């Protein structure tokens, strides 16, 4: 078999079971691809020896029979996940040198299922960003190029390294996290599938926290079937996470029939934004037609508080971040600034945090501290919480009225050039306009590649589902994927 690193999880699993390939073969193919792809800036901590050790163990387990679906599958792990004995820095200087003595629950579940970790993946610092330009390691780069241009494009963020690695066939799949769109937006920018599960489906234990009421881990894969396979392995109850849901995780793959006849798909009028590119409008209309042709019933719906989602999100998320990031003080772990003679503990805190956090993280911490301050708590934070409740109620009412899933664009544009929006925070924040509502409401959402723009760049649509019904959501995504027939791959330039 050639190009083993280009296989899907499902195809690799089947080949492993038939003895047509070994996990060591798959792992070596990925490690070779990684070594040739430094220009993509994806893997920031490579673990080849550990990967081959785990691959050999996976092969032995497969030979014994009855191995889990993920056994022997080479994957990348976002740098936000704590991985035992392997640097886990959240792409920040302030965690320089931090090697956890424990494994996050999600990466531990994958390890226990026999998945092979190839290394840690680039991301925006502390998951704060939409372009992977805030990382201490430097930019991750999209493997796609626009037309004949050789301009470097963003892979999206914050899970930009994960998206680029999967799209560039450096690994078969990767973990991501999604606080306001950080799985779905990069997936759409790179032509892959990204699933953000219901809040509470994946344990947050051992994942460096950004905004605790919004953060959720999920799979980033080449196909919807792969998302079903990997998602199931990542999900499940964890007593160490107080927000983890003790709800059974079904066999999502077994639910992929592609039959959506009679399913009601909602099209929210509020997602038609002023100035939205014609290509996005056309993509959305085409996706709607595809689902209708597959037997779904299309219904226009209203989510009236959508316009308040972005402002509410950019109050709540920074507020939680300012609280979560208060622990980084240079005392117990990570980076500590050099002290001048006479400096005390206050100076150490100030210098360490000023030098350890990048500009975007500092910006959000300051915003969060401001909105939580005594004089502004009610005016900003409490008001944003009330708006969040209204947004959730909008979705609850739509689903209660019989809608099975909601179809929207995943992003307001295709991938843009690195450096283009980094100087304008508001412009950058607008990249999350279609995705933040899902986090605020705690719902599952999935980005599916469905077309390309005039420059040949991938475009994705988002499906939003009912809470805890990832299986139904993935089946609808499976039908959309089949109808769209997206098979484009980036031309290799790296």
Swiss-Prot record:
Reactions mediated catalytically: L-glutamyl-tRNA(Gln) + L-glutamine + ATP + H2O = L-glutaminyl-tRNA(Gln) + L-glutamate + ADP + phosphate + H(+)
InterPro entries: Amidase, Amidase_CS, Amidase_dom, AS_sf, GatA
UniProt entry keywords in alphabetical sequence: ATP-binding, Ligase, Nucleotide-binding, Protein biosynthesis
Recorded coiled-coil stretches: none
Similarity comment text for this entry: Belongs to the amidase family. GatA subfamily.
Function: Allows the formation of correctly charged Gln-tRNA(Gln) through the transamidation of misacylated Glu-tRNA(Gln) in organisms which lack glutaminyl-tRNA synthetase. The reaction takes place in the presence of glutamine and ATP through an activated gamma-phospho-Glu-tRNA(Gln).
Name of protein: Glutamyl-tRNA(Gln) amidotransferase subunit A
Gene: gatA
């Amino acid at each position: 078999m050639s190009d083993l690193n280009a296989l899907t999880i499902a195809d690799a699993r089947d080949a492993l079971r038939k003895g047509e390939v070994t996990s060591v073969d798959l792992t070596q193919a990925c490690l070779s691809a990684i070594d040739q792809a430094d220009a993509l800036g994806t893997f920031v901590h490579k673990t080849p020896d550990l990967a081959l050790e785990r691959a050999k163990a996976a092969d032995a387990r497969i030979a014994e029979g009855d191995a889990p679906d993920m056994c022997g599958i080479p994957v990348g792990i976002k740098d936000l996940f704590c991985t035992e004995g392997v640097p886990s820095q959240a792409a920040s200087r302030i965690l320089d040198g931090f090697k956890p003595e424990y494994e996050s629950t999600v990466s531990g579940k994958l390890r226990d299922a026999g998945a092979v970790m190839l290394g840690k993946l680039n991301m925006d610092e502390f998951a704060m960003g939409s372009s992977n330009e805030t990382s201490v390691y430097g930019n991750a780069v999209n493997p796609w190029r626009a037309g004949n241009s050789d301009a470097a494009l963003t892979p999206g963020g914050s899970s930009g390294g994960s998206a680029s690695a999967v799209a560039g066939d450096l690994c078969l799949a990767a973990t991501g996290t999604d606080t306001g769109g950080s799985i779905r937006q990069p997936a759409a920018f790179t032509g892959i599938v990204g699933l953000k599960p219901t809040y509470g489906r994946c344990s947050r234990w051992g994942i460096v926290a950004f905004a605790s009421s919004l953060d959720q881990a999920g799979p980033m894969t080449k196909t919807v079937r792969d998302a079903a396979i990997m998602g199931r392995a990542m999900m499940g109850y964890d007593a160490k996470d107080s927000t983890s849901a003790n709800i059974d995780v079904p066999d999502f793959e077994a639910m992929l029939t592609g039959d959506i006849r009679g399913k009601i798909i909602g099209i929210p009028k509020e997602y038609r934004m002023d100035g939205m590119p014609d290509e996005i409008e056309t993509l959305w209309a085409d996706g709607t037609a595809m689902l209708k042709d597959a037997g779904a019933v299309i219904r226009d719906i209203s989510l009236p508080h959508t316009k308040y989602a972005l402002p509410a999100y950019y109050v709540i998320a920074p507020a939680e971040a300012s609280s979560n990031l208060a622990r980084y003080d240079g005392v117990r772990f990570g980076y500590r600034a050099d002290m001048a003679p006479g400096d005390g503990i206050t100076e150490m805190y100030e210098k360490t945090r000023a030098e350890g956090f990048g500009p975007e993280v500092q910006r959000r911490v300051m915003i969060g501290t401001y909105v939580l301050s005594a004089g502004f708590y009610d005016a900003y934070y409490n008001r944003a919480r009330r708006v969040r409740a209204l947004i959730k109620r909008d979705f609850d009412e739509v689903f209660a009225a019989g809608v099975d899933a909601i179809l929207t664009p995943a992003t307001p544009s295709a991938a843009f050039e690195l450096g283009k929006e980094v100087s304008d925070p508001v412009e950058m924040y607008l990249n999350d306009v279609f995705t933040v509502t899902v986090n605020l409401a705690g719902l599952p959402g999935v980005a599916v590649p469905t077309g390309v723009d005039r420059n040949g760049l991938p475009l994705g649509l988002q499906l939003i589902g009912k809470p805890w019904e990832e299986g139904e959501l993935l089946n609808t995504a499976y039908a959309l994927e089949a109808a769209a027939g997206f098979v484009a791959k980036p031309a290799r330039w790296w």
